[in-house]
Regions:
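C-terminal catalytic subdomain
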Residues: 22-126
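Active-site proximal loops enriched in glycine and acidic residues that flank catalytic Cys/His/Asp
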Residues: 2-5, 16, 44, 48-52, ...
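Flexible loop/turn segments at secondary-structure boundaries
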Residues: 8-12, 54-59, 135-138, 174-177
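Accessory "access/gating" subregions that flank catalytic or transport cores
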Residues: 1-24
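Structural signal for hydrophobic packing residues in well-ordered secondary-structure cores
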Residues: 2-5, 9, 40, 44, ...
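Extended hydrophobic packing segments that form well-structured cores
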Residues: 115-181
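Short, glycine/charged-enriched secondary-structure capping and boundary segments
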Residues: 16-17, 61-63, 181
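Generic detector of short, locally flexible boundary/turn motifs and exposed helical patches
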Residues: 10-15, 89-95, 129-135
């Protein structure tokens, strides 16, 4: 499945679409917007097109910075992260202050963005970031990187086989697929 990730989401108005938001748009919104069964077969490849910048807005997403750079190198396991770190972020006085008196999302918000992508993470066999401008953001998310869509399709075919079918999920920012047998 190929899908483009727009540079906007419900969580980045007037700020950068940071790596965690790219992840939630891909494996959360785009993957999960279906009825009956996923558009992508179990173990299939999701190719996303996005530059995957390592950009965070410290005014709106301060806890996302720490989540990405401190927690993800340790583990991408949502259950582990929840048990070990969610309360720490939720009760962090600096994050609480920025949430209450500034413009920041709640300190625990990056966890919920990570959880929303969990169903997709458990279903896909591989995610390839086509056009990612660096290697470390896709790697941190557990993805592979391709220079362009042609290279990403070749990588997917080497994983799924030369006769693999390609579905282009061409949708507005948020859509819902109705898939039936």
């Amino acid at each position: 499945m190929i899908t483009g990730i727009p540079d906007i989401s419900p969580y980045n108005v007037y700020s950068a679409l940071n790596p965690l938001l790219v992840q939630v748009m891909a494996l959360g919104y785009h993957f999960n917007m279906y009825r009956n069964k996923p558009l992508l077969r179990k173990g299939g490849v999701m190719i996303i097109t996005h530059p995957c910048f390592d950009e965070f807005d410290p005014k709106f997403h301060p806890s996302y910075i720490e989540f990405f750079h401190r927690l993800l190198p340790e583990s991408r396991d949502a259950f582990f992260l929840r048990e070990k770190y969610e309360r720490e972020f939720a009760t962090n006085p600096a994050y609480i202050e920025m949430y209450r008196r500034g413009n920041a999302y709640h300190g625990a918000h990056p966890f919920f963005m990570w959880y929303w992508g969990e169903n997709g993470r458990q279903h896909v066999g591989k995610v390839i970031g086509a056009g990612a401008e660096n290697a470390h953001v896709p790697e941190m998310l557990g993805w592979e990187r391709a220079d362009n869509l042609t290279e990403a399709i070749a990588m997917a075919r080497s994983y799924m086989g030369r006769n693999a079918e390609i579905t282009m999920l061409h949708q507005p920012i948020i859509g819902l697929c109705n898939v039936s047998d």
